[in-house]
């Protein structure tokens, strides 16, 4: 069983996400929150959360700030950003805050489930459009205003190959097969 929580302030988006997840009997929804502060409070009272699906733009406390606080106090909780935002600032700040995966809200149910399981198994999943932007961010890191020297991650050739495969929409399983990773 996979214990999840959702932080989402929009009722329509929350209900859509719940409906998508209801197709998977091994997913148990433990909590929902309307903002990042509530998400933190839910985790403080329930140590059984495996994964948190986190929106970015919410009142009181946004998802990026909440992610940073949760990762400091509860590093075992995996966080998947699930949002409509695919701009560079959101991507960079979410990853910097500690998000484990980053997908868009229009992602199909099966892909959300795959993202959850891959993330729980130590993977990092990105929607293809997000992976493309992340790759561009890394390639252009020296020219971007919000990178300091310690922020610029040095990727190995292998890590760059994997990110390029993600940007093409390949699943973690396909990437492993394509790059001969066991």
Identify the meaning behind each predicted range:
Residues 8:
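Conserved acidic carboxylate
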Residues 35-38, 62-65:
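Acidic catalytic/metal-coordinating carboxylates
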Residues 47-53:
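Active-site beta3 strand of CheY-like receiver
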Residues 55, 83:
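Active-site residues of response regulator receiver
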Residues 58:
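Receiver (REC) domain active-site loop signature in two-component systems and cognate sites
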Residues 136-165:
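Regulatory hinge/linker segments at domain boundaries
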Residues 169-182:
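Recognition helix of helix-turn-helix DNA-binding domains
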């Amino acid at each position: 069983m996979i214990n999840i929580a959702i932080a989402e302030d929009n009722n329509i988006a929350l209900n859509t996400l719940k409906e998508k997840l209801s197709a998977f009997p091994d997913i148990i929804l433990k909590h929902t929150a309307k903002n990042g502060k509530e998400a933190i409070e839910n985790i403080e009272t329930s140590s059984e959360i495996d994964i948190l699906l986190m929106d970015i733009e919410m009142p009181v406390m946004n998802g990026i700030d909440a992610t940073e606080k949760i990762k400091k106090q509860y590093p075992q909780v995996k966080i998947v950003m699930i949002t409509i935002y695919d701009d560079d600032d959101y991507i960079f700040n979410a990853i910097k805050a500690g998000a484990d995966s980053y997908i868009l809200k229009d992602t199909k149910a099966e892909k959300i489930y795959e993202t959850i399981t891959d993330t729980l198994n130590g993977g990092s999943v990105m929607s293809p459009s997000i992976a493309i932007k992340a790759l561009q961010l890394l390639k252009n890191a020296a020219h971007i205003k919000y990178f300091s020297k310690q922020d610029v991650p040095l990727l190995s050739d292998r890590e760059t190959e994997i990110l390029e495969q993600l940007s093409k929409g390949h699943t973690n399983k396909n990437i492993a097969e394509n790059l001969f990773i066991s």
